[in-house]
From Swiss-Prot:
PROSITE patterns per the UniProt record, alphabetical: MFS (PS50850)
Gene (UniProt): SLC16A5
UniProt entry keywords in alphabetical sequence: Cell membrane, Membrane, Symport, Transmembrane, Transmembrane helix, Transport
Chain segments annotated as transmembrane: 18-38, 54-74, 81-101, 111-131, 138-158, 172-192, 240-260, 275-295, 306-326, 330-350, 368-388, 397-417
Name of this chain's protein: Monocarboxylate transporter 6
GO biological process, one term: monocarboxylic acid transport
Organism: Homo sapiens (Human)
Stored Pfam families: MFS_1
A molecular-function term among this protein's GO annotations: symporter activity
Domain of life: Eukaryota
GO CC annotation terms, alphabetical: basolateral plasma membrane; membrane; plasma membrane
Family: Belongs to the major facilitator superfamily. Monocarboxylate porter (TC 2.A.1.13) family.
Keyword Cell membrane: yes
Residue ranges annotated as Extracellular topological domain: 39-53, 102-110, 159-171, 261-274, 327-329, 389-396
């Protein structure tokens, strides 16, 4: 008996929204608590800072880089099965990591397997919101983002409590049971009815291929379908954005990994050090939805890329404050300021990508974007660990974070401004060319041949059939002297047409 489909924007959609919030809190909020175990793991395995840093870097990198693989599973099995599969993998990885005898085993279990499972769960839960919510989609995404903030708030406090009572091995075993709640959230996600019925097409049989060539061809088609390498060649803004975000990611995750060890290095109590991460999460509960709603306002549409650069700049400057002092109350003020810039970055990072790339190319652009960001996440913590081993000073880690964030903000802001000026220059040249064409047409008669670029510009607003008039309203056949009195208005309207402005009433 077929299962009944749920209706979009129905009452069950809010239950799915709650499940999505829980899933995001369990998955995206988890990496922020890894810093609490940093010193404990370092002592357990007698490892350097760089070697210990590979654990959070692998976890975060796989969490972002496995996005295209998750998209394939969603297309094949659906969101419900993928969320539940992710919960099983994340749980299996944490349980296995509690029996690790060296860091290599920890990298594979708690790093790779758990990161893969968390990616499957969180990305599938976000995808299903687009089917369950149509009219209230913006509100649903804003509320779902609160789950991340709740996770950032609760994971550090729970981790500190379990670590004191059970040790890191017992804590990771409990975490394995907690991640099984993703399976419950996945079971709540029922199939939803869509307005578009799937089309059945009869495809011709594929040409015969050898098994090796067929596998390589299938992999190539899959990569081409989910990763937008062709957009890099044709969209300069996309290239600038990817380079800028990758450069900023080399510094952005460092405070979340090293803030707790840095506070303990300055003799801050362990409970208070764990509380710092929770302050960031609690502040984001209110700031992140507010930033998301403000970023969606039409008044900010043309300035979103500059606001994103400003948020990165503020994030880098706040890290300088953290590096200057390790006093607890100074760190509390740092966490509050860091939360403001962090919420702006989280609200704008994908919205700016939507502004730069056409929506029909957005899924492929997002796939390449997450993969390249994952590479940066993989490099960032070990690079900071090498710096820490060389200097034995945590302050240099925050100086390093500030350098990457501030330089990325200046690069993106300057590059976007230069691209905007270049585009405005092209539009001005087109307007001047249209002005010259109108002058020649008025002077020499309607039979004069237009230049190709002018024909392209004027084709956007063709002349109505049966009306043979110039842009300023005079009939083409009546070339009297009063045409020249209206010439300034004609030039103004021509420029407005070329630049895409609305004509004055």
């Amino acid at each position: 008996m077929p299962q009944a489909l749920e209706r979009a924007d129905g009452s069950w959609a809010w239950v799915v929204l709650l499940a999505t919030m829980v899933t995001q809190g369990l998955t995206l909020g988890f990496p922020t608590c890894i810093g609490i175990f940093f010193t404990e793991l370092q002592w357990e395995f007698q490892a350097s800072n760089s070697e210990t840093s590979w654990f959070p870097s692998i976890l975060t990198a796989v969490l972002h880089m496995a996005g295209p693989l998750c998209s394939i599973l969603v297309g094949r099995f659906g969101c419900r099965v993928t969320v539940m599969l992710g919960g099983v993998l994340a749980s299996l990885g944490m349980v296995a990591s509690s029996f690790s005898h060296n860091l290599s085993q920890l990298y594979f279990t708690a790093g790779f397997i758990t990161g893969l499972g968390m990616c499957f769960s969180f990305q599938s839960s976000i995808t299903v919101l687009g089917f369950y919510f149509v009219r209230r989609r913006v509100l649903a995404n804003a509320l779902a983002s609160m789950g991340v903030s709740l996770g950032i708030t609760l994971w550090p406090l729970l981790s500190r409590y379990l670590l004191e009572n059970l040790g890191w091995r017992g804590t990771f075993l409990v975490f394995g049971g907690i991640f099984l709640h993703c399976c419950i959230c996945g079971a709540i996600i029922r199939p939803v009815a869509t307005s578009v019925a799937p089309e059945t097409k009869e495809c011709p049989p594929p040409p015969p291929e050898t098994p090796a060539l067929g596998c390589l061809a299938a992999c190539g088609r899959t990569i081409q379908r989910h990763l937008a390498f062709d957009i890099l060649r044709h969209n300069t803004g996309y290239c600038v954005y990817i380079l800028g975000v990758m450069w900023s990611v080399l510094g952005f995750p460092l405070p979340q990994v090293f803030l707790v060890p840095y506070a303990m290095w300055h003799s801050v109590d362990e409970q208070q050090a764990a509380l710092l991460i929770s302050i960031i999460g609690f502040s984001n509960i209110f700031l992140r939805p507010l930033a998301g709603l403000m970023a969606g306002r039409p008044a900010f549409a043309s300035h979103r890329k500059y606001l994103f650069s400003l948020a990165l700049l503020l994030n880098g400057l706040t890290n300088l404050v953290c590096a200057a002092s390790g006093d607890f109350w100074v760190l509390v003020g740092y966490c509050l300021a860091y939360s403001v810039s962090m919420s702006g970055i989280g609200a704008l990072i994908f919205q700016v990508l939507m502004d730069i790339v056409p929506m029909d190319q957005f899924p492929r652009a997002l796939g390449l974007f997450t993969v390249l960001d994952g590479l940066a996440f993989l490099i960032s913590p070990p690079l900071a660990g090498l710096l820490l081993d060389a200097t034995n000073n945590f302050s240099y880690v925050f100086y390093m974070s500030s350098f990457f964030l501030i330089s990325a903000a200046l690069f993106m802001g300057g590059s976007f401004y230069a691209l905007q000026k270049k585009e405005q220059g092209k539009q001005a040249v087109a307007a001047d060319a249209l002005e010259r064409d109108l002058f020649l047409e008025a002077k020499d008669g309607p039979g004069k041949q237009r230049s190709p670029e002018i024909m392209c510009q004027s084709s956007r607003q063709p002349r109505p059939a049966g009306v043979n008039k110039h842009l300023w309203g005079c009939p083409a056949s009546s070339r009297t002297s009063h045409e020249w009195l209206l010439w300034p208005k004609a030039v103004l309207q021509a420029k407005q047409t070329a630049l895409g402005w609305n004509s004055p009433t």
